[in-house]
Amino acid sequence: MNLRSSLACTSSDIARWGLRSVLKRQGGVLPGRIAMKIDPYLLSDLASLVDRSVVITGTNGKTTTSNLIADAVAASGATVVCNRAGNNMEPGVVGALLEARSGLKRAGGGKRVGVFECDELYTVRVLPKLKPTHFVLLNLFRDQLDRYGEIDHTQEVIAHALELSPATTLIYNADDPLCASIAARVPNASIAFGIDGATNTESDRISDSRFCSQCNAPLEYDYVQYGQLGAYHCPSCGWARPALVRRVTNVKLSRDGYGFDLVFGSDSSAPAAHIDTRYNGLYMVYNVAAAFFAAHELGVDTAHLQPTLDAYVPAGGRMGRWDIAGRTVEANLAKNPVGFDRQIQSIKTAGGRLCAFFLNDNSADGHDVSWIYDVDFERIADTPGLVAFAGGTRAHDMQVRLKYAGIDAAIISDVAQAIGAVADEAA
C-alpha cells in the first residue's frame, strides 16, 4: 500500500473506534466512506486480502443469499469477510474489508474468501476494483423507480460491470429472462441455474419482462414459477431459457416448508444434495439454490449445505419468526411488487389471518410508493376472519390501497400495537 492507502486505513480505524467506543454505534458505512474520501481506489488494494471472492446482486434476496454463502464457506474452514449488515454500496464493501484485514492477514493465503452483497447500480464501481472470481445474479424486478429508473438501465449497468471484470464467472438465474439476456451479451464464463420443472405454485399477475430480449416478440412459457421466472422461449427468433448447468429438481412443499434437490451438473450422473427448508416461499428455493451453487463453486463440500441452512439466522426484518401467546408471528421485508406478492403468497399458504402492513418512504425505501398498486392484495381479501392493520410513515396510503382490495385496515402507530392485537386475538 502507498502512503495514501495507509492513511485511509488508519482514518477508517479511528472512525470505527470512535463510533463504537464513544458513540456506542456500529459504524455502518461511515468508516468505509471516510477511507474512500482519502483514497477513492482503496478497494483495488484491499482486493488482494482475499484469495477468492463472490459478489451477489439482484432485486430480491441479496442479503439472505450472501449470508448463506458466507456461512457455508466458513463451515468449510475458510476465513470469510462479508458485509453481513447489508451495507451493499462500495463504502460498505470497503468497510468490511478494512475491519477484517488483520484477521485476513493472519489467515495466510489459500483460504481467505470475500462474500459481498452489492447494490445493482454499484456493481459497476465494485467489480472493476475487486475483480471477484464469481458474480451471482439472482433476479431483476422493478424496484424504487425514483432511484433505479427502468429495468433496462439496471441491465446496462450490470452488463458493463461484468465487461470491466472479464475474468469473473457469472452464476445467474436462467429462469429470469432479464438475467439470461445479460449472460448472452457479456464475454464472461457463465453458469446457468434454475428450477427444472413446474412447481405448480400460484403465479403472480405481475410480469416485468415477458418479451424477447433479442427481437421484442412476446415470450411463450412452458410454465411460470412467479413473476417472469420460468421456462420461456421466443416463437419468433428461437431465443429460449439457456440449458441449466446447475439444476433444482423435485421441489415439494410440505407443512414444514419446501424441500428440493440440488443437482451440480446437467446430466443424471451429476452429484446432488437434498435440501429441506423451513420456509414456504418459492423465492427462498431460488435464494438457497443460488447460495449453495455459488458455495460449491468456492470449494464447499455438499455435506456442509444442509447444516448451514439449519443453523441460519435471518437478518433483521427478514423471515423472523416468534411464538407470542401461542401464536406464530412472522415478520418479513418487501421493497417491490414481486417481492411483496411473494409475501402475500406466503401468508395465503400459511393461513395467516392477522396481518399488519407497514409502508415507509425513507430515502433507503424510495419515496415513490405507487408500486403498492401493483401488489396483489386481492389474493387474501377473501380470507375468513382476516384482520388487517396499516402502519408506517405512509400508513394512510397503505390503508387506501387495502380498501381498494376490499380489505378494511385500521391504522396503528407501531409494531407493539400489532403484537398487542395478536395477544388479544389469542386471549
Region spans (language model):
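Short, conserved loop/helix-junction motifs that constitute active-site signature segments
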Residues: 128-131, 161-166, 183-187, 349-351, ...
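Phosphate-binding loop of NTP-binding sites
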Residues: 3-194, 201-211
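A conserved, hydrophobic alpha-helical segment in the catalytic core
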Residues: 129-139, 228-243, 273-310
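Cys/His-rich short segments
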Residues: 196-257, 278
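Short active-site oxyanion
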Residues: 111-114, 166-170, 327-329, 382-389
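Gly/charged, well-structured mid-domain segments that form the phosphate/adenylate-handling core
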Residues: 239, 253-255, 294-330, 334
